[in-house]
């Protein structure tokens, strides 16, 4: 052992002074440093718990992100990985995973169950899917915060005891957020996890598909709860009084469900409650005065229920209220005077009730924070309340549909933020004064004053409007006021106006051409006036209707509040409509206009609706109308138009309504595309029209351009007709003889040598041998289930009776479909393609070969094809029961034959066929034109998707939509109007519309009013929002005992038609959901909702 003294002495010189190190000493120091580094490196590698690391690697292997992939590497300490945190214990266990908004897709693997110390898991706002692992919630028994919101997790919650790690039955979980997923099933009181979540403070499962009753037992198991959100699900039954046991509850949200019964009075004993959100249910009863005990309440929203009675008189005790929305109920009485004590109100909506009395008793001046005030569609009387002019923060106010009197006061100018103001359908007077004052509202963008100021004269002087008047006005409506005078010249100064409604007045004079100079005007209604003269050509220079780019550039920054701007349709009930949904439109119907329809109308290529009915227009229908490729409605009825209906109008693929009744038109009605679907009544009143839906033959002599004298016969003409008839018959006989001979010369094994030319009109004639023509043999694929080995064009023509009109069984975007009956009795469906498709013709053979390989039990099989000169023919399986459209809309007895099990099976079959196209078939196929007429039914009503793949076949998300292939009106996804790209999610939207057709029995365009577009979808959303989902169902399906299943399907359909394509499910999800819905009768008879009338 070395003596301490000697040791001190030996190292003393080294400490006291620096001497050059010997080589041996340098080597020693380097080795020492290296060993220390290796030691710390080994320690570093050992920081991450190996079991946790493996679990995380397994997790990363199950997820992916094209946007922001995880860069987790086993060579790096997992505690340093992005989104991962570890504790400070010797084991260095993972305690936190935070990977929100990373674009992750894939499943959540069961490996996360091995993270035994995990206290926080946040995977929100990703694209994760699939079920949650069994035992997931109870296995993670250290979890404090769980956030899986905004994903696509499906299935039931794994709420039972884990089969993995044990638990003492107590879970420290504090926050659970599973909102905005696809979860379903009931939340039962037998849940081990929820029964043991004593410290739970926040539980959010909104925007899923949970069923059963609200799990009120949670208030007993988790007395610390402060937030419960069950909104946007399918919960049913009553609200339980057990919810009152959540004594600390500050937020209770259960809106947009199927809850019924009364609001339990016990809920009004929750002293901390700040938000009570229960709209769009079927709640009934009265609002008990005990609600005034909720003195901390800031939000009370009970709209779209069946609540009746009066608003509690002491409502003013809720002095902290910022949002009070009780609209669309059956409330009666007057607005309590005490409401003025709710001085913090920002939103007050009492629209569509049965409230009455005068408004002057309410001191609105105390609402200094009020921004939105909606008292429309009640029965308020008396003077217009002047105290509203003191609400300095007001941006929108509606008093429409009441019985208010008086005049607009100059005090309205004190509302400097006012943007939306409508008081239509009241008894206001002094239009000139109102316009003089309101033009000073600098931010006013929407002004609707319809059905007021009766029989007054509109100020017409151009100088009436100041140079700075109405600087922001975009929506202007003074319809149905019976105003007199001419169209006021000062309107030319409204340079930002987009929507103008002057209908149902008594305006005289001519339509001023300067209307066509308003740069943003896309919606003009001059209907039901006494206007005379001709249509000015300048009117058809509206920039917003000439260019899609100009139309898209309109600002549309007005407030999105529902309005009624259609007073001229007195035969229908008033309906609320979003201003942004108004289609590009010109209504000039029922006036006294004369002259011709200017050819300049063809410049308005953005126009969706053109209605000129009920005038005295003469001349012909301009062929230039065919340039309006977005046109949906064209009504020229009740005029003096003559000549023929332009055949070019058949190219308007969006056209869903066409009416030329009661004119003097002549000649054949165009056939093909939508013209085969327009009703006969839309062509009546034109004695010289023939063909088409009139089913009358067109006699060439009947429409001769040479006018015959009375009782006289032109002998030259008769001689010419006789000679022509003689030579025509002779030529036909010769051709028939040649065809018979050619048929006899063709042996069955040499049928490919038969050469026949198919003309555009469907007739055929022999072609000289040796001519360079394409094959005339019909090529049948190996998947053909028919015993037909050889089939020639001649036999196909014979089977269709030369494509006779009597054999037409369908009409698609590419041409007509004929029934072909072969000699052996076999029936086929023959689609004869029409038009010039350019690139598609060059690739026709290759594309149909690809289509023939698409084999699925729910796809109409392509049996064969033929290419011959300009003719393109496809051979399909014949479906005995025709199309779904026929059974739903055309056959009067059809809907009754489609009971609920049949309709559900049709949805299941069609969705399966579409899923095959989207996910299995190679290349994937975007259908582009899913509609009820493209879903065919066999003899057992099994569904088959038809017309698939006739558009260009390329990979998903890269399919450009052309005017020929964009789809059918009513089924077209909204995003197709912004980016002309067909997508898989676009198909899902269209299929959602088909589902709504099956549920409602209505056409996609059947319920819309002249100023609304694609309204089956909007109508269904409105009915759901107003708490009346059962009322959308086909009356033939109601009270069938299947209401629960139908409501589930309705929810699925509504997800499919979501305006945001990214929020739509994929078609496989739809298939899975539909498979889980049973059609048997529901034993729980649902209470029928009361009729609600929205005036």
Curated annotation (Swiss-Prot):
It is an enzyme of class 2 (transferase). The modification Phosphothreonine is found at residues 792, 800. One of its GO terms (molecular function) is identical protein binding. It is found in: Cell membrane. Expressed ubiquitously, including in the shoot apical meristem and in the elongation zone of the root meristem. It catalyses: L-seryl-[protein] + ATP = O-phospho-L-seryl-[protein] + ADP + H(+); L-threonyl-[protein] + ATP = O-phospho-L-threonyl-[protein] + ADP + H(+). The active site is at residue 929. Its EC number is 2.7.11.1. Gene3D superfamilies: Phosphorylase Kinase, domain 1 (3.30.200.20), Ribonuclease Inhibitor (3.80.10.10), Transferase(Phosphotransferase) domain 1 (1.10.510.10). The modification Phosphotyrosine is found at residues 876, 916, 971. Autophosphorylated. It is a multi-pass membrane protein. ATP binds at residues 809-817, 831. One of its GO terms (biological process) is unidimensional cell growth. Residues 803-1074 form the Protein kinase domain. Glycans are attached at residues 62, 73, 165, 199, 204, 207, 258, 341, 377, 430, 569, 592, 616, 627, 640, 662, 714. LRR repeats lie at residues 91-115, 116-139, 141-165, 170-195, 197-221, 223-246, 247-270, 271-294, 295-318, 320-342, 344-366, 367-391, 393-415, 416-439, 441-466, 470-494, 495-517, 518-542, 566-589, 604-628, 629-652, 654-677. InterPro entries: Kinase-like_dom_sf, Leu-rich_rpt, Leu-rich_rpt_typical-subtyp, LRR_dom_sf, LRR_N_plant-typ, Plant_LRR-RLKs, Prot_kinase_dom, Protein_kinase_ATP_BS. PANTHER family: LRR RECEPTOR-LIKE SERINE/THREONINE-PROTEIN KINASE-RELATED, NON-SPECIFIC SERINE_THREONINE PROTEIN KINASE. PSYR1 and PSKR1 mediate a signaling pathway by two distinct ligands, which redundantly contribute to cellular proliferation and plant growth. This is Tyrosine-sulfated glycopeptide receptor 1. It comes from Arabidopsis thaliana (Mouse-ear cress).
